[in-house]
């Protein structure tokens, strides 16, 4: 007897009201996309739960893809048996025996959705538990802190048996919360900010500023690799590569060095806002953490925010560096981020940047030079690419080869 189903629990989505069907539909669509490489799978999404019928597909491979889908709280590997006592007992034992690791204790949990089942819950517990005890060695019951919880859901005609419970990514399905533009620098912080934004159900497009020849092709590839890594958590990431050399050279020449960092960030915001308007995005996300560097003080953020009417989302604002690194390691972006290639933020770095820049001064310095043509040129010459999960791209290429 093998696992035939995966039962998915929604978590936070269950708090939604009239628009819950939209959340469920989006999650189902995202799951179907992530499981494209498993053609035999069938998915049924109800108001409270999602049922994935494996039809012979490898449950471990499917589980590995499911764990990165936002909107899933937990999921269980399940066996489906007839709602007859002997079948339930055999199924419970089979599921228990498939649990890996050092198992010494267990308990039985029974949920009778089908109230006409001839036995009550308190009668079923010793029957099922006793069958497991009779057919195993050195195993005891522990109802308070068991190594394994054998869950039985009894329905009309059939029952689900579950032992293996796994955590999902949590959050909300990507796509239910609109779209934002993420400033993706290539450092540790901004990919984590993108990940946390997606976790709230928001689609992301990334904007990266590069300044050749001061930044290398390897630095550019590093950002492409980061965007590629983020596709594990969504359908695709659109990456906009913005040429920033002329803007930076002009800032370095025309703006006092203490304000060059502030003005550079303001130019980035202006350009990103223009791209956001083109792409129908509703906000801008950055990887700023309060007080981490000179451009991330409250005074700096206040001055930088002046140039955009878009909401600026800062998911990392109260995190320290170790907290951010921990998430980066967990999501697979850390090793890419620490590749030793410079980005445009490290080019022309001033010796003493202003930590409390004033809006009035920034505006006065910028007024001495017309940056509008440079902004227009940067937006017009951006390079845009769409990145998808490697497995999905491979499947699509394989399909195209048939024609």
Curated annotation (Swiss-Prot):
Location of this chain's protein in the cell: Cytoplasm
The family database entries (InterPro entries) matched by this protein are listed as: Rossmann-like_a/b/a_fold (IPR014729), ThiI_AANH (IPR020536), ThiI_fer (IPR054173), ThiI_N (IPR049961), THUMP_dom (IPR004114), THUMP_ThiI (IPR049962), tRNA_STrfase (IPR003720), tRNA_sulfurtransferase_ThiI (IPR050102)
Task: Give the CDD domains listed for this entry.
Answer: PPase_ThiI, THUMP_ThiI
- Record's keyword annotation contains tRNA-binding: yes
State a GO cellular component annotated for this protein. cytosol
Task: State the similarity comment.
Answer: Belongs to the ThiI family.
Stored HAMAP family: ThiI (MF_00021)
User: What role does it play?
Assistant: Catalyzes the ATP-dependent transfer of a sulfur to tRNA to produce 4-thiouridine in position 8 of tRNAs, which functions as a near-UV photosensor. Also catalyzes the transfer of sulfur to the sulfur carrier protein ThiS, forming ThiS-thiocarboxylate. This is a step in the synthesis of thiazole, in the thiamine biosynthesis pathway. The sulfur is donated as persulfide by IscS.
Protein name per its UniProtKB record = Probable tRNA sulfurtransferase
Lineage per the UniProt record? Bacteria, Bacillati, Bacillota, Bacilli, Bacillales
